Swiss-Prot record:
Protein name listed in UniProt: Type II restriction enzyme BslI subunit alpha
Effect of residue 79 to A: 50% of wild-type activity
Keyword Repeat applies: yes
Taxonomic lineage from the root: Bacteria, Bacillati, Bacillota, Bacilli, Bacillales
Oligomer and partners: Heterotetramer of two alpha and two beta subunits. The alpha subunit is believed to be responsible for DNA recognition, while the beta subunit is thought to mediate cleavage.
Length: 225
């Protein structure tokens, strides 16, 4: 892999984007991110939610006797409140969850260390987007090619670059690195836009802004990220 493309790969990794090198290809990388189908927010595969109500795991212990909360870093597995000695379990934090309001269900979850105990049958991976609540996700993926220039980007030169590198898919994207007074400016153009575009502008001084363009998040009204 050439140095310019390698630097682009590292920049994507630094912005929490997964990067892969296609078999038998050295002129491009594949970048992908698991996102919500509805709003585009990153789908947090490392998070878990309550089986009963969907509340996120806040990673706290709770005494099953007095209700005192503890950080998971607590070395003790029993409550330190004087005269209590209750057992620390990982309950759902939603006070209206039936794992707290229904005695039979609460007893069943507590016996397994709480809803969020690693060995509990009620501990499930994230099933809802943390931003909009959607249940659908997908991998948004691009095949990335790097084009570096010290002069104003030229559409004809980019078309020739695309032809030489055999770009042919809507997922193929050219990342443009335009060096101006020793300062790098970034731009991009999808293969699908090459024939209809007559002018290229490189408007991003930060690579993270370019990533936000490729993986936009459309926050629904009345929802705060």
């Amino acid at each position: 892999m050439e140095r310019q493309l390698k630097s682009i790969a590292y920049a994507f990794v630094a912005n929490d984007i997964d990067v892969y090198i296609p078999d038998g290809e050295s002129n491009c990388i594949v970048v992908t991110k698991l996102v919500c189908k509805d709003c585009g927010q990153y789908w947090h595969t490392s998070l878990s939610e309550c089986y009963f109500c969907g509340t996120l795991n806040f990673y706290l212990y709770e005494c099953n006797s007095c209700g005192k909360k503890y950080s998971l870093t607590s070395s003790s597995k029993s409550c330190d409140t004087d005269g209590c000695n209750g057992k620390l379990i990982k309950r759902c934090s939603n006070p209206e969850c039936i794992s707290r309001t229904n005695e039979e269900i609460q007893r069943a979850t507590d016996e397994q260390g709480g809803v969020f105990d690693l060995n509990s049958s009620f501990n499930v991976s994230l099933n809802h987007c943390v931003t909009c609540g959607s249940k659908e996700n997908y991998y948004k993926t691009y095949r990335i090619y790097s084009y570096r220039t010290e002069v104003e980007p030229n559409i004809e030169a980019l078309r020739e670059f695309a032809n030489n590198n055999k770009l042919n898919s809507d997922e193929d994207v050219i990342i443009i690195k335009h060096l101006v007074d020793n300062v790098i400016h970034y731009g991009y153009i999808p293969y699908s836009k090459l024939d209809e575009t007559t002018e290229i502008t490189t408007t991003f001084s930060r690579f993270s802004d370019l990533v936000s363009e490729l993986f936009p998040v459309n926050v629904p009204p009345n929802v705060t990220e």
